């Protein structure tokens, strides 16, 4: 017969801290055991009791030992405390977490998207090492031949010594020192000693001048054009265009005026901004303890969903200023259906990869997904990620449009936030067409945020972006540098522009020897400098647009990890790139504009650290140097002038000239290696086409919104923005002033040319004498007569006698 069920059996009992013993007693009372198994149960209970007694003795001994130790030191996590709870560690009394120093941003997010394959890039270091090995091999052969010749000479000399008499033995001391009255000895000794004294004195004076120049504030040399340009600049500052000011007032949202008697809101900490705990944990992970001025101003406004136009100096934390509010808003998104809601556009691939690394670190304690869509990485990998509808897409404009037109799983109808980093560059001619294509496709009702260190104040450019009464947040004065930056200028006198590479090599070999970025205007100059640095024994790597994405990532990582001391780059690396520990920036020549100069020198002196920027400037760079010095003086930044001895620069220039043939041979060998690699790639491409012909032909053709001609025109405009008009000014009718300049230039190149004087114009002088010499005895001029000269010459007949 089944046991009788209790009425309370249907209830599910809960456990509490004080009900453990009572509940076990109740269960034992309500569930009686079968009487047939009582004997067996008793035996088992006896055995268990003996085991329990032994265990209890051991436990009592262990408890006695544990009482002597610190309580809880060896306990595992029992889940009693919330895992998200954090203790606020005090660091120097400021409330910041005392964390380990953050190591910097990596390129791990981009590596998974690199195109796989066995494509091997041409390595300059390998070519230089190969040539050195060949030289060593040939040198060893030459040394062996010299040793054989020397041995033969020694044998002949020993035979002669044996035949010579003993009186002919010479002392070594007489061989080392010649007599004072010998040939050439003592001649001009006074002059030489005087010259040595003068040189020593001049060296001491030069050293004093260098010390004084390094510590003195540079004053630009007076120039006839400076006065007029300064006057025009002052007029522009004073007479602001009232129409532009009215446009600006109507376009931007009015500034919030503080209420009288109310305390101003100070967002001195991230906790005071009411950010979520996962975001605060992400900020602590990367070592952000206190918000920068641009962050404390931008984050509260961006959290309200308003459009923002932000500007601050380089290295002030603008990336985190727009990523933190984006992540905070995404924490409260609907999560049932995955949707792409944010697009962040960058002008360069490296900047987008870095922004992806920053966003991933800050969102490491959330479930927000990111996708990196930049050129040079695998399209298939990016399409697979976009198919999962990531929350944030970080991209360059070209690849974003490519996916927008050719990836069927990617839609932009759900975008709610658009961010343009380095917005002034994005609004320039090179990116204008691509940006217009994106803005006309994405939804109009969105939040738009623009950030840059040199933010444009032109309302016409900002209207194109579709901003809706944006809030203007400019922390620092426009076109200013970091306060911890020291700017140096090296002036090249007229006629010494060709020695520029000598000055650069002297700086890199003797003054700035590690953690240096050198900027060039053109890719070919950066590549040639890379070869010269390799031949000079300086560890360098290059970064420019002619390199593949894999090469570019490897170059930046080699410089970041300390494998290379110098990064030779074009303006590709001038914007946004944050590499930890960059001490110095050198401008091989001044850039096209002051804005580009600010971005270049902003690669150092970031986040409160000190740094130096050195510019090698010639006469054509006067305009940019003058603007930089004027802005720095207005700001109160330190500007110094560095003087390098001409002899030092000349010696390095001579070394470069000696390398000219070897540089050309290396370039030729590199070109041959590239042609071979290209041929191998074409062979593999043809083989793949033969193996997968049906699949390749079945793929839909990729489309673009511009023709090839329009793409080339846009590319040309972008180059002109960076380097100016390549072909010079457009040809037109020359003024008399320009003609005079050209004539003077031609005379300087040709040397002094004889001109007519007053006597020659009056028919006298040298010309009259020359005319008299040309006449013959009969008074007729020499040469053919008039009628004879008019006759045509025979072509086929017999010769006249």
UniProtKB/Swiss-Prot annotation:
InterPro entries: DEAD/DEAH_box_helicase_dom (IPR011545), DEAD_box_RNA_helicase (IPR050079), Helicase_ATP-bd (IPR014001), Helicase_C-like (IPR001650), P-loop_NTPase (IPR027417), RNA-helicase_DEAD-box_CS (IPR000629), RNA_helicase_DEAD_Q_motif (IPR014014). Its main location: nucleus. It comes from Sclerotinia sclerotiorum (strain ATCC 18683 / 1980 / Ss-1) (White mold). Its EC number is 3.6.4.13. Residues 18-32, 156-179, 193-214, 227-243 have a biased composition (Acidic residues). It comes from the Eukaryota. ATP-binding RNA helicase involved in ribosome assembly. Keywords: ATP-binding, Helicase, Hydrolase, Nucleotide-binding, Nucleus, Ribosome biogenesis, RNA-binding. Residues 785-801 have a biased composition (Basic residues). GO terms for cellular component: nucleolus; preribosome, large subunit precursor. SUPFAM superfamilies: P-loop containing nucleoside triphosphate hydrolases. It is found in: Nucleus, Nucleolus. Belongs to the DEAD box helicase family. DDX27/DRS1 subfamily. It holds the Pfam family DEAD. Associates with pre-ribosomal particles. It catalyses: ATP + H2O = ADP + phosphate + H(+). The keyword Magnesium does not apply. Residues 1-10, 735-770 have a biased composition (Basic and acidic residues). ATP binds at residues 312-319. This is ATP-dependent RNA helicase drs1. A motif (DEAD box) lies at residues 421-424.
């Amino acid at each position: 017969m089944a046991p009788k069920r209790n009425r309370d059996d249907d209830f599910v009992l809960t456990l509490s801290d004080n009900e453990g013993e009572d509940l076990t007693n109740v269960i034992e009372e309500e569930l009686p055991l079968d009487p047939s198994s009582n004997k067996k149960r008793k035996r088992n209970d006896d055995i268990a009791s003996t085991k329990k007694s032994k265990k209890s003795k051991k436990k009592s001994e262990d408890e006695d030992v544990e009482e002597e130790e610190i309580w809880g030191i060896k306990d595992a996590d029992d889940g009693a405390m919330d895992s998200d709870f954090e203790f606020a560690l005090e660091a120097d009394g400021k409330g910041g977490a005392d964390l380990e120093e953050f190591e910097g941003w990596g390129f791990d997010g981009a590596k998974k998207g690199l195109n796989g394959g066995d494509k091997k890039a041409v390595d300059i270091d390998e070519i230089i090492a190969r040539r050195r090995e060949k030289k060593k091999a040939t040198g060893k052969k030459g040394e062996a031949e010299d040793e054989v010749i020397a041995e033969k000479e020694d044998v002949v000399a020993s035979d002669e010594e044996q035949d010579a008499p003993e009186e002919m033995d010479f002392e070594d001391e007489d061989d080392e020192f010649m007599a004072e009255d010998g040939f050439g000895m003592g001649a001009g000794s006074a002059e030489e000693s005087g010259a040595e004294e003068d040189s020593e004195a001049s060296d001491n004076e030069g050293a004093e001048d260098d010390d004084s120049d390094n510590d003195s504030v540079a004053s630009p040399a007076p120039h006839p054009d400076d006065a007029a340009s300064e006057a025009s600049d002052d007029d522009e500052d004073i007479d602001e265009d009232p129409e532009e000011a009215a446009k600006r007032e109507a376009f931007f949202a009015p500034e919030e005026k503080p209420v009288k008697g109310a305390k101003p809101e100070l967002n001195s900490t991230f906790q005071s901004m009411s950010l979520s705990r996962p975001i605060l944990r992400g900020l602590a992970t990367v070592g952000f303890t206190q918000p920068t001025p641009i962050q404390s101003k931008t984050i509260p406004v961006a959290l309200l969903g308003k459009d923002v136009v932000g500007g601050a100096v380089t290295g002030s934390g603008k990336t985190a200023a727009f990523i933190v509010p984006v992540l905070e808003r995404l924490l409260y998104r609907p999560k049932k259906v995955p949707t792409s809601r944010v697009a962040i556009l960058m002008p360069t691939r490296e900047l987008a990869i870095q922004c992806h690394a920053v966003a991933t670190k800050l969102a490491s304690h959330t479930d927000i997904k990111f996708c990196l869509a930049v050129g040079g990485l695998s399209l298939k990998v990016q399409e697979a990620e976009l198919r999962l509808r990531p929350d944030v897409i970080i991209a360059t404009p070209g690849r974003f449009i490519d996916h927008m037109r050719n990836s069927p799983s990617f839609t932009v109808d759900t975008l709610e936030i658009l961010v343009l980093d380095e917005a002034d560059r994005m609004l320039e001619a090179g990116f204008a067409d691509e940006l217009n294509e994106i803005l006309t496709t994405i939804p109009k009702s969105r939040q738009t945020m623009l950030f840059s260190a040199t933010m444009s104040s032109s309302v016409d450019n900002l209207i194109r972006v579709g901003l809706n009464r944006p809030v203007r947040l400019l922390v620092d004065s426009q076109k200013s540098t970091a306060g911890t930056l020291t700017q140096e200028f090296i002036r090249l006198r007229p006629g010494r522009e060709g020695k520029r590479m000598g000055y650069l090599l002297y700086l890199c070999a003797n003054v700035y020897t590690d953690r240096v970025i050198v900027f060039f205007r053109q890719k070919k100059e950066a590549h040639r400098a890379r070869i010269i640095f390799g031949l000079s024994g300086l560890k360098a790597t290059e970064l420019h647009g002619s390199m593949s994405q894999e090469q570019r990532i490897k170059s930046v990582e080699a410089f970041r990890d300390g494998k290379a001391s110098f990064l030779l780059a074009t303006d590709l690396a001038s914007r946004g790139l944050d590499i930890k520990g960059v001490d110095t920036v050198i401008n091989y020549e001044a850039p096209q504009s002051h804005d580009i100069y600010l971005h270049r020198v902003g690669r150092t002196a970031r986040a409160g650290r000190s740094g130096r920027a050195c510019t090698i400037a010639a006469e054509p760079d006067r305009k940019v140097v003058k603007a930089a010095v004027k802005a720095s003086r207005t700001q109160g930044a330190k500007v110094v002038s560095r003087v390098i001895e001409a002899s030092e620069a000349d010696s390095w220039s001579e070394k470069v000239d000696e390398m000219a043939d070897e540089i050309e041979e290396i370039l030729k060998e590199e070109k041959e290696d590239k042609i071979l690699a290209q041929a191998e790639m074409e062979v593999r491409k043809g083989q793949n086409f033969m193996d997968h012909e049906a699949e390749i032909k079945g793929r839909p053709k990729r489309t673009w919104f511009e023709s090839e001609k329009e793409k080339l025109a846009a590319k040309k405009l972008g180059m002109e923005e960076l380097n100016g008009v390549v072909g010079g000014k457009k040809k037109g009718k020359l003024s008399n002033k320009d003609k005079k300049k050209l004539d003077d230039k031609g005379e300087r190149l040709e040397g002094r040319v004889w001109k007519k004087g007053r006597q020659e114009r009056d028919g006298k002088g040298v010309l009259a004498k020359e005319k008299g010499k040309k006449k013959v005895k009969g008074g007729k001029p020499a040469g053919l007569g008039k009628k004879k000269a008019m006759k045509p010459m025979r072509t086929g007949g017999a010769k006249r006698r």
